[in-house]
Each structure stands twice: as structure tokens, then as C-alpha cells.
Amino acid sequence: MNMEPKYNPREVEAGRYEEWVKNDYFKPSEDKSKETYTIVIPPPNVTGKLHLGHAWDTTLQDIITRMKRMQGYDTLYLPGMDHAGIATQAKVDAKLKEQGISRHDIGREKFLEHAWSWKEEYASFIRQQWAKLGLGLDYSRERFTLDDGLSKAVRKVFVDLYNKGIIYRGERIINWDPEARTALSDIEVIHEDVQGHFYHFKYPYADGDGYIEIATTRPETMLGDTAIVVNPNDDRYKDVIGKKVILPIVGRELPILADEYVDIDFGSGAMKVTPAHDPNDFEIGQRHSLENIIVMDENGKMNDKADKYAGLDRFECRKQLVEDLKAQDLVIKIEEHVHSVGHSERSGAVVEPYLSTQWFVKMKPLAQRSLDNQKTDDRIDFYPPRFENTFNRWMEEIRDWTISRQLWWGHQIPAWYHKETGEIYVGEEAPKDIDNWVQDEDVLDTWFSSALWPFSTLGWPNIDADDFKRYYPTNALVTGYDIIFFWVARMIFQGLEFTDRRPFNDVLLHGLVRAEDGRKMSKSLGNGVDPMDVIEEYGADSLRYFLATGSSPGHDLRYSTEKVESVWNFINKIWNGARFSLMNIGDEFKFEDIDLTGNLSLADKWILTRLNETIETVTNLSEKYEFGEVGRALYNFIWDEFCDWYIEMSKIPMNGEDEAQKQTTRSVLSYTLDQIMRMLHPFMPFVTEKIWQSLPHEGETIVKASWPTVREELVFEESKQTMQQLVEIIKSVRQSRVEVNTPLSKAIPIYIQAKDENIKATLIENEDYIHKFCNPSDLTIDTHIDIPEKAMTAVVIAGKVVLPLEGLIDMDKEIARLEKELDKLQKELDRVDKKLSNENFVNKAPEKVINEEKEKQQRYQEKYDGVKNRIEQLKA
């Protein structure tokens, strides 16, 4: 037995992970008789180091896989990383810029060499962080989204979907980043509320009779207007449908058309249509066969269709255009207006809705299959279930997916254009007469390859691959609720389309890690927390337990250093409890010496019963992914019952003369501590391995130890009830001692009036516990007691607990002291009451301050009532 006096996470964790990996503990057993359990890690981007969200995500996955391994499953936890197209390219671009060069200076091939070097560097950082977190990953199966095998899967999926008519090339409105000069996925667009303006302009009728009022937040796009639309049910405009207006500045005639898309109650009820620069306008344009006029180039500058504004930046054009409209008396008003504006997550540029020729996935048929699958036995279960509604809603409202990106880093689209005829060839391999063809320069959206992650990582498209046959479909996906649509949904429809099976059985969704004040963590706010710093200070086990138990499924988690520290204190409590137990168990006691059939004491039977109840609770809650509740159950059992009560109670036989009883106590201590370590292991892998190795045990590592199961022969319901009665009596005596300022070191007479003869006999049989915890000078247990005139009485389940006060305290002095305390409490109550009844304070003070005052009021009132009650007792 080698345990330091104080828990030191650095010493406990040093070298442990390397030992696990070296011994292949995390590799699947591949025992065909075992049921499989698979989780593929959501691949982190190779753009940088892992943040707290990653730590939370992977901790939950590791808890599940460690638990399943202990439950006898052939478990695979597969690692991997994502190439993260635009994000990584932006990082490499920035690095090149520091050297005074751009990717255009060095060309595509050389740039990709730099990108691969970046990937290798940051992949190494990520693996180091996985190790620090203690993740039970099988590194022999690590994958990367640009691996040859995964690239082959990507090409096959693209070609198959193209041949089915689901992938097509066409013109549609996409999110365009004018700075990075690429299309963006919706998740790469960050919407921020911006103080802008609502511009109201006059569009004169072509016949010269008045004007129609049009409002817009983007005046520069009006240069591409091709129509005005009104709602056919709007009585104000029934007579003008079919008429024409003149587009200001440009002079082009625009028809006034009827379309039910228009909101009658918004603005003037008339809307300009710019099909090439707004997704909704594009749909209207398609319905009415309107011309698509693009007025900007890919850099966000006005093109030659913008007439005299050609060459101006879009925002400069806006200013100039408004001034020109003012000069022509065509501005009705300009209102201050806060509206949501999309910004590129990478470049920060304002995203432009832009008509562009891109590659798209036709989503309706794929989404419908996903929806239909949720009505079958192959359905996917969402945790919490409410997120299934979110999934269904998004699938019902889905639009076609832009999958091409104007980048160099990524899966180059497997499409070639004939140099002479312009014919398109799409194939998994390049055309044989390659000299006559040029490949599409664009790459695929990162989400395209990550949508194949659950099956491409296991060997697909080779459906005979051993891993694909054995470990697919996977069992659980653990990820954040913010990417249900962007990633979860896409994995589901690709899995169904290409494997005819759901890619995973369960989806466990967690929230975001927020700062302690509830704000989102971000670099700009400077409130981010590096998980490696937390591990350095408190250890991986403290961070893991906090992350896993700090919230319920689907909810956000507020990071708190204080709470991580409290977990450290919990582990230190476990450490001290284990250390005491091991000192009493002794080095001579072996695993085979554990015998729970001997003469078990009441405390032994109680702790074994509570252990079995905790095993059942923890196992059942874990199956539902309710790790917050699991944490509470473990904390209460280990801290309150095992450490604070049973360990103290075990000192009675261990300090006694009965060797047989000592041996039984050693068995119970050893067995209970062993089972606690096993339950805690998925949450705290490092410290549990350290303690378990010091315990009498079978096997080489707790990683491969079996999960605890309920043993009915070790459940003693009657003993549990008896112990509950004893604990209540002990707590009552201790509380009464506090109330009359009598320390535990001072022996006092204690009377217990039992409800009946059975309870009396049980209490007498177990009075050793009362002697140890209450220090009576004289202990009387009977069914009838003459209660002294001056005494403190507490009603408990077993009857009454009576403490005579005569000679214990000076009654007059104690009453005077308590009355003085009561007076002080009354003054505090008056002060708080006055504050909370002040309307000015209640209306102006922050909610947090008001709540603090209310909490004070409640505390003072409880103290006041308690002191008043004690005075009445003493006077009685």
C-alpha cells in the first residue's frame, strides 16, 4: 500500500495513460462472442487546440465507452480529426502572410504542402490533449477526413448522388464571403445584431402618376431589381398590379406583380425583388421568370451592371446611391434600425447573399427518408427527446445544400470539364484522356466528408471490411445541440442512403460551455478557459467529473473554478477514505480473503445495502445518460454514507478485540471500496486506477475490471431502516449539543424513549454506535421515561431523544444570551424588510441584488424562528 497523505493529481496521473496505451487496453477485444459497442469521436478541427466544449464532449463519450467495456462489451472508441476546409485554409493563409507571401504566390500544390504540415503539427497537439483527458481511444484506427480511404468514400458518394440526380450543378443564392472569396455553409455564418438603417424610397409609376413606397436595408442591391411584388389580397394595391414603375437612377421599367409571399402588414406592403442578391427574392424570381441581374463581383465591389457605381465597394456604393436619391427627392425617410447581419465566421466580412454557379445536393428526398425512418424500428433515439422535434422540423423545412467551396484545402470535386466541348464528366477516377480535361478547382464543403464519418472510418465503401461488418452501425453519437442540422442530420441521411441503416442508435446532445455569468466563452470577451490549464491545477479527474455531472442532457454548462475545486475536494475525501481503509485492511489481506458471509454488523449490512442501491441507481441512470443525477448519487453515497458514517463506524470493531469481526470489517471495507472505484472509474479513470491497484484485486487494470452488479444476498432492508433510525438519533443529539453550546467532548446524560419494545431491543443491541457518536455519560433506552422538567426533546422516527439541561448550562445566562441574539436578528430582519418594501429599490436594483436580499431575509427568519423556539423550550 503506497498512498501519499494528500491527493496529488500530478503524481497520480503521471505515466498512467502511456501505460494504458502501451498495454493496448483501449483496443477492442474482437471477441466474437461479445456484443459490440462503438462510438466514433466527433472529429475536432485541425485548426488549433481543444477547448472546454471538446473536453465535455469527449469526456461523456469516454465515460460511456469505459462503462460499456466494464459491462462486457467489445468496445471501440475511434479517434479522428477533420481537415476543416475554410478554417484551416484561413489559418495557413495567415501564417503565410506573416512570411510576406500568399497562397497565390506559391500555387496550389505548394500551399497544400504547408496545409499538411499544419495538420501534422496540430494533430500532435490534439493527441496530447486527448491523453491528458485520459480518453480510451484506439489510436491504431485513427482517421482523418482527407485520408485515402475516406477520400475514396467521398468520391463514391459524390458520384453516386450525381448519377441519381441528387447532386447537380446550378445557379442559386448562396452565402458568399467577399474577403475569403468562397461560398459558406450556414454554420460558417455568424448572425449579429447591427445598428443600421431602414431606407424608404420612391419608385415612380411609369405613367407619371405618383409612386410606390419601397423599404430596404441594402440600397446597393436595388440596382439589380427586376420587379415589385404586392400581396394579391392587399386592397391598397389591387389596381396597380400589372402596372410598371421606374427603377430610380437606372431608369429600368419594373413590373408590379402579385405574390402571396409578401407580408401585408410589413412596411408599405410593397417589396422590391432582387433575384440575384436575396434567397427569398430568388424564389419569387423563379416563380415569375424574372431576370437575374448580378450587380457585384466576388470581391464585394459593384460590377458594370451597376452603371456609374461600377468599381465601388458595396458599402461605399450604398452611401453614394442614397445621396444621389436624396438629390432626386426620391428618399421618403431613413429610420434607425437594428437588424441581424450575417458575418463570416473566419474572415469577419459581412456575408453577401449571392447568385452563383455551384454544386448542390437536392435535399428533399434525403430528408424525407430520414423523417420516414423515425417511424420505423430502426429509428434513432434522441436524448433529450425534445430534440427529435427540432430534427424533424429542420428536415421538413430543408433547402438544397451548397456543397462547393472556392478553396484549395479539401476534397477536390471529382468533376472534369472537356477543354473543347465543355462536357462535364463526373467519376471516382479521372478521365483516361486526362490531357483533354480540366478538373473543377472547387473543393467540397467540410460537412460533406464529415457526414460520412460513422461508416467511412470503418472501411466503407468496402462493405466486407471487418470493422464495417462488426462495428457499424455505431451505438451512440455524443455532440452539441448546435450542430443537429449541420452534422447530425447529414450523417443520418447519408447513413440511410448508403448503408440502408441508421448510423447510430442514440444521439446524446449536450449544450454549450458558458462562462460563470452565463455569457458565451469567446476570445473577444477574454473569458475562455483552456482545459489543459484546469488539468494542470486540479487534475483531469476533477475536470472530467465536473463536466460530466455539472448539467443534464441538452442544457448548457456554466464553467466554475469553485465547482472544479469542490470536485478536487471530493476526490481528496475519497483519497483519505481509501487511505484509512487500506491502512486498516493491511498488506496481508488478499482478494481471496474477502468473505461477506460472516457475522456482519448492522453497519456492514447497511453499507452493503446502500452500495447495492447505489449500483442499481448509477447503472440505470447511466443507461439514460443522466450523468448529473449519477454524480449526485455517487457523491451522497461516497461522501455522506461511506466516508462520514461507515468508515467511522468501522473503527468500533477495528479497535476491538474480536479478530473475526475485524476480518469481516476488512472484507466489507475492501469490497465496498472496490465497487466504489469501479463505479467511479469511467468518470475518474486516473485516481480510481491508483487506488484500485493498492486494493486487494484480481486482474491487471481497473480499465478491464467488470462493472458492479446488484447482489441480492447483500441487501438487508431491515438493517437499512434500523441504521436510518440510529443516524437520525445521532444527528438529533449532535444538533441539540450545538444548540446548547455543549461540545461533543463533554459527556452528558442521554435518554431515548423508544416507540415500542422491538425498537428498544434494536437500539440496545446497537448502542455502541450511540456511545461512539454521542458520548453519553449515561445512556437510558426504554419505552417509558420520566422526562426531566428542564430538558430538550426531539421527536424522531424511533421515538424521542431527551437531553436533560439541569447542570448542563446556566439557564438564566443562556436565555439572556439567546434573547440578545434574538434582538440582533430582529434588527437585521427589520433592515431587510424595509429594503424590500422600498419600491424605488425593487424597481431599480439588479435582479441579482434583490434575490440576495430575499435570501438574507429567509436566512434571518429561519435563525430568528430557531432562537425563539430554543428560548421557549428553555423557559418551559
UniProtKB/Swiss-Prot annotation:
Species: Staphylococcus haemolyticus (strain JCSC1435)
E.C. no: 6.1.1.9
Its job: Catalyzes the attachment of valine to tRNA(Val). As ValRS can inadvertently accommodate and process structurally similar amino acids such as threonine, to avoid such errors, it has a 'posttransfer' editing activity that hydrolyzes mischarged Thr-tRNA(Val) in a tRNA-dependent manner.
Span of the annotated motif 'KMSKS' region: 520-524
HAMAP family the UniProt entry points to: Val_tRNA_synth_type1
Enzyme class: ligase
Keywords, ordered alphabetically: Aminoacyl-tRNA synthetase, ATP-binding, Coiled coil, Cytoplasm, Ligase, Nucleotide-binding, Protein biosynthesis
Subcellular location: Cytoplasm
Keyword Manganese tagged: no
Family affiliation: Belongs to the class-I aminoacyl-tRNA synthetase family. ValS type 1 subfamily.
Major localisation: cytoplasm
Renumbered ranges of motif 'HIGH' region: 44-54
Reaction equations catalysed: tRNA(Val) + L-valine + ATP = L-valyl-tRNA(Val) + AMP + diphosphate
Annotated ATP binding sites: K523
Protein name: Valine--tRNA ligase
Gene: valS
Domain-level remarks: ValRS has two distinct active sites: one for aminoacylation and one for editing. The misactivated threonine is translocated from the active site to the editing site.
Subunit comment: Monomer.
